[in-house]
Amino acid sequence: MIDTSIPLVDLHRHLDGNVRVNTIWELGHQHGIALPADSLETLAPFVQIQGKETSLVAFLKKLDWMVAVLADLDAVKRVAYENVADAALSGLDYAELRFSPYYMAMNHKLPIEGVVEAVVDGVKAGLKDYNVKINLIGIMSRSFGQAACTQELEGLLAHKQHLVAMDLAGDELGFPGELFNDHFKRVRDAGLAITAHAGEAAGSQSMWQAIQELGATRIGHGVNAIHDPKLMEYLAKHRIGIESCPTSNLHTSTVVSYAEHPFRTFMDAGVLISLNTDDPGVSAIDIKHEYRIAKSELKLTDAELARVQRNGVEMAFLSDSERKALYAAKI
């Protein structure tokens, strides 16, 4: 099912959406933060999706607990370190960890640039202990508005040498991409690649805007592209990568079932598409789970899964030499 001769990658993986349950428990008690449960065992349902629960509101509440316990920069560093460990332990050869420093900082009024530094330090420490390649993607959380995104952008650009790309995430309908054109001009001027959450809550026009105005070469989720034949043709022709996260799409009610997920439609249209975990801590999944789901629920063959695996390597924000090194390590 997973081809061991091809690097296994996860390109759409939120660092701040992957905080271990025991870490939430320990940090909560360490910092005197009131938690919604009185034991580690009973905490899990408040911070992780249970069974077939599918609700965007419930999902976001669980996600909020992941950052509620980030009371100081040491906590941020710990979570970043554990993200590297989790990536390695799940069998990944390469992961791009994306994070929103404003979202991580807001509960306890941490310095945004300090959060970025703590993430970088935690990842560096993790890479000393675990054999996995990691790159970082900064996120601007559009839901907090343009001014907050400017603060976030400045904190991230102060450490641009530690980033490969920038992302736009959050409320796609309330805060359309047009509001952030100037922000992304600064991103392009800084020489960073661009991905954007688009076509998830909004229609295909949001994806066109992300590609044509923000400069995105990859799109997160993008499920609504299938309703726009011209866009599908454009995506395939220009190798715009779709970072697909089927289980997360189900958990957030972006799709009503795996059977309704458009992954197969993208594949058949020749669009470059990869499998990813999104918020693995909230969804309680790993990348192997997504490949199992792709086979059993999305009905992909082993040959198609291998193609998806290769797509991920092609889509990665890596140089050609880095890509070759990933493949060489699999021989």
From Swiss-Prot:
Substrate binds at H14, D16, G170, D279. The keyword Zinc applies. InterPro entries: A/AMP_deam_AS, A_deaminase, A_deaminase_dom, Ado/ade_deaminase, Metal_Hydrolase. Keywords: Hydrolase, Metal-binding, Nucleotide metabolism, Zinc. It catalyses: adenosine + H2O + H(+) = inosine + NH4(+); 2'-deoxyadenosine + H2O + H(+) = 2'-deoxyinosine + NH4(+). GO terms for cellular component: cytosol. SUPFAM superfamilies: Metallo-dependent hydrolases. Gene3D superfamilies: Metal-dependent hydrolases. GO terms for molecular function: 2'-deoxyadenosine deaminase activity; adenosine deaminase activity; zinc ion binding. Binds 1 zinc ion per subunit. Zn(2+) binds at H12, H14, H197, D278. The record marks H221 as: Important for catalytic activity. Its cofactor is Zn(2+). Its EC number is 3.5.4.4. The active site is at E200 (proton donor). It comes from the Bacteria. The keyword Hydrolase applies. One of its GO terms (biological process) is nucleotide metabolic process. Catalyzes the hydrolytic deamination of adenosine and 2-deoxyadenosine. Belongs to the metallo-dependent hydrolases superfamily. Adenosine and AMP deaminases family. Adenosine deaminase subfamily. This is Adenosine deaminase.
